[in-house]
């Protein structure tokens, strides 16, 4: 049974509930996930399926992947990814119909990259005084002590690269499933920018 799928983040909109209230939702387009290989605990040490998704020209596919698609007699796919803990058969297609309204899902993707940022933007630090000649408007302040401990502790929040990391938002509600358009509407925002690849997994699976 398919409990997870790869999708593409499209845009945010709003949906109206039965009581007339509007809630913000993110529309995820589920391109058909074709199972190209099955991993078993006996042979591979874990249970998983490899799926291919995303349209691509045949000339853009390397030879090993082209051989896989030719053997399965399916059009080339841009991405080959694994879904752990999911069972299936080679050639099976996983789509939006694996979910239904009311399900709770975890959505994982890479967050938007923000580049090198300071502590105010990266960690939400409060700023310093902006008047009376202060030069410490957005400075992080003291980061260590003097003679003891005479070092900076590990984990100290400091300026650095922000974003572009794997983020999972848990327990989002599936508001609507449109099997004809291969769309899943989930309540709230999900990581990543427009057209980002996201993994949707049922909560508790």
Swiss-Prot record:
One of its GO terms (cellular component) is cytosolic large ribosomal subunit. InterPro entries: Ribosomal_uL3 (IPR000597), Ribosomal_uL3_bac/org-type (IPR019927), Transl_B-barrel_sf (IPR009000). Gene3D superfamilies: 3.30.160.810, Translation factors. The keyword Ligase does not apply. Keywords: Ribonucleoprotein, Ribosomal protein, RNA-binding, rRNA-binding. SUPFAM superfamilies: Translation proteins. One of its GO terms (biological process) is translation. The keyword Protein transport does not apply. Residues 128-150 are annotated as: Disordered. One of its GO terms (molecular function) is structural constituent of ribosome. Part of the 50S ribosomal subunit. Forms a cluster with proteins L14 and L19. One of the primary rRNA binding proteins, it binds directly near the 3'-end of the 23S rRNA, where it nucleates assembly of the 50S subunit. Belongs to the universal ribosomal protein uL3 family. This is Large ribosomal subunit protein uL3.
